[in-house]
């Protein structure tokens, strides 16, 4: 499963884990991706999206129809 948010495009970042002695080692910061089913009233069906917590807030604010329109304008297949 890819760890990319379909709404915001968030993906894993690379950084350092830093010990108390200030030794550094590589690590990945993973986004909070959830697979969530959204009811789309206009299409009368559920749509499953992989979205981050921030992406869910965007959907709450703008509405699922507006977000889907933006995704389709980018050329994403839903």
Swiss-Prot record:
GO MF annotation, one: structural constituent of ribosome
- What is the protein name for this chain? Large ribosomal subunit protein bL28
Q: According to the entry, what is the taxonomic lineage of the organism?
A: Bacteria, Pseudomonadati, Pseudomonadota, Gammaproteobacteria, Cardiobacteriales
Q: Has UniProt tagged this entry with the keyword Ribosomal protein?
A: yes
InterPro entries documented for this protein: Ribosomal_bL28, Ribosomal_bL28/bL31-like_sf, Ribosomal_bL28_bact-type, Ribosomal_bL28_sf
Xref: NCBIfam families:
L28
Family statement drawn from the similarity comment of this UniProt entry: Belongs to the bacterial ribosomal protein bL28 family.
Organism of provenance:
Dichelobacter nodosus (strain VCS1703A)
Name the gene that codes for it.
Answer: rpmB
Signal sequence span is: none
Could you state one GO cellular component term attached to this entry? Answer: cytosolic large ribosomal subunit
Q: Which UniProt keywords apply?
A: Ribonucleoprotein, Ribosomal protein
* A GO biological process held by the record: translation
**Which Pfam family would be a valid example here?**
Ribosomal_L28
């Amino acid at each position: 499963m890819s760890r990319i948010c379909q709404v915001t495009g968030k993906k894993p970042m690379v950084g350092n884990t830093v010990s108390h002695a200030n030794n550094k080692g590589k690590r990945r910061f993973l986004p909070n991706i959830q697979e969530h089913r959204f009811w789309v009233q206009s299409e009368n069906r559920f749509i499953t999206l992989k979205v981050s917590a921030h992406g869910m807030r965007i959907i709450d604010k703008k509405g699922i129809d507006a977000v889907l329109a933006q995704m389709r304008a980018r050329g994403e297949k839903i």
